[in-house]
Amino acid sequence: MMKKIQRFGGAMMAPVLLFAFTGIVVGLASVFTNTQVVGKIAEQGTLWYNFWYVVAEGGWTVFRQMPLLFAIGLPISLATKTNARACLETFALYMTFNYFVSAILKVFYGIDAAKQIADGVTGYSAIAGVPTIDTSLFGGILIAALVVYIHNKYFDKK
């Protein structure tokens, strides 16, 4: 059991390694767009500000799409065979799950998740552009674990 927990912990490192670099990028962009640090060159509308704003948005990608990155990153270490295929399977199932949840909210409960997100209602998020319930990292990890289990168990079955 301890080996499985250690293996899972090691698998969590793949997505976590992205945090350091993107955190530095976001931090630098925040400093360079602060008028108290850089001066008038960092005011909105200047070329300097626009450049660092674009850099910051690129840096925020990892933090905004964490559930997706964890869902795709876990099979890299946890799948025993053809881990790239397991990653693709996980991505497909995770996105399908989010589309299902979005459709269920709309059809059965009359909730437009996109409107809820726009209105700032908590509990909703857009994952890769799909408005859905905010399952945070837990949803991505749970789907990844399910897919890896099924993949490892049935990949070689005929």
Predicted regions and their residues:
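Early transmembrane hairpin of solute transport permeases
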Residues: 2-158
